[in-house]
Amino acid sequence: QTKFRKWKKYYIKSFEYKANKVRFGAYGMVALEGAHITAKQIEATRRTLTRQLKKVGRVWIRIFPHIPVTSKPVEVRMGKGKGAVSHYIAPVKPGTIMFEIDGASDMVSKEALLKAGKKLPVKVGFVDRSKVGDITMNEKFVASLKGTRAARKLAEKKDFGNQKRAFT
């Protein structure tokens, strides 16, 4: 993709089918919903991960904020062109592996990833590379999905129901 100076609005429409596997580390943080994540949120998450792991593990960031978001100055009337670029976002689809960790124990990695996930505007899950397709989701998230459009979409997708294709 070309990095234009100003983009049109970017909408997240589907599930992630490419960046849904843990490729570099042993553990990963997966997005359970779609959202736009800013560069500041990615940096805050990275800092939390490195502080939690201290000097033991290594962190990979799998998302990059490449889409500019524009805004007009305060108290400026409409018209006169598109506003200036205010910040950059990374579009994240459900199922995207956002961060990966290696070199730390299972317990430390899980705790670090779930604690760092609180810095992001999406619900996150923990993926273990050795347990293919296994995701630790909190019960509150699963309960919140029941009867929603997202739950129906998950049920419609045959491969997505057992989470083999989406999160392996």
Where are the predicted features?
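Ribosome-associated RNA-binding proteins
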Residues: 1-168
